[in-house]
């Protein structure tokens, strides 16, 4: 395969993955058809099955894992510069509230959208979403532990923060308001503050 053809092939696959991510985020996994993905990607319909022979389920799993890694990078970039874990948490939620408004209250997190739809019907996708959430919690637990939260409390704190964020996104979408995310940020910062005080 020539270099040009390899680049073109890689680009087509990237476009399909990106289109799947955006459509799953906006319309959900079950509400998105493969023809829609091909059209949004500007790719021949058959090329989806060339790159993802497992079909929609394989594409869905890759969207979950790829998006999970991207969001973990965003979390890290937002919070790592802060030594103050309380301020880091509050500012991360403030940024999330801004993002929710920017995307016009569509779900900014495709992982949560897919998880809610398929958790009881597709074990592969359920496992993928669970592993992504665990990776976020592990990362945050390490971050809070490094900031002084005892190891036994760090994971519980991280789990609470992730749960607050994901729940707030859902409430924000329903209300078409960023206020639930801001309120959750206040609660999350208080949880981190209390965990540090108990150190």
Regions found by a protein language model. Give the residues of each.
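Hydrophobic alpha-helical segments that form the core
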Residues: 107-113, 152-171, 183, 187-191
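Hydrophobic alpha-helical connector segments
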Residues: 62, 75-107, 157-161
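Short secondary-structure transition hinges
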Residues: 90-142
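N-terminal intrinsically disordered/low-complexity leader segments
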Residues: 1-11, 198-199
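All-alpha amphipathic helical-bundle segments outside canonical DNA-binding/catalytic cores
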Residues: 87, 127-128, 146-162, 179, ...
């Amino acid at each position: 395969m020539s270099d040009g053809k390899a680049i073109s092939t890689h680009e087509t696959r990237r476009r399909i993955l990106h289109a799947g991510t955006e459509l799953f985020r906006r319309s959900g996994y079950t509400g998105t058809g493969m023809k829609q993905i091909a059209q949004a990607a500007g790719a021949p319909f058959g090329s989806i099955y060339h790159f993802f022979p497992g079909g929609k389920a394989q594409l869905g799993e890759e969207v979950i894992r790829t998006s999970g890694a991207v969001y973990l990078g965003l979390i890290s970039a937002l919070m790592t510069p802060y030594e103050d874990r309380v301020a880091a948490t509050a500012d991360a939620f403030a940024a999330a509230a801004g993002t929710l408004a920017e995307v016009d209250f569509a779900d900014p997190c495709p992982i949560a959208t897919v998880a809610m739809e398929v958790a009881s019907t597709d074990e592969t996708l359920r496992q993928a979403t669970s592993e992504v959430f665990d990776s976020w919690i592990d990362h945050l637990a390490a971050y809070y532990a490094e900031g002084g939260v005892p190891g036994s409390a760090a994971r519980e704190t991280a789990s609470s923060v992730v749960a607050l964020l994901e729940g707030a996104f859902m409430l924000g979408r329903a209300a078409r308001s960023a206020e639930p995310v801001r309120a959750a940020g206040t609660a999350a910062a208080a949880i981190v503050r209390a965990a540090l005080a108990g150190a």
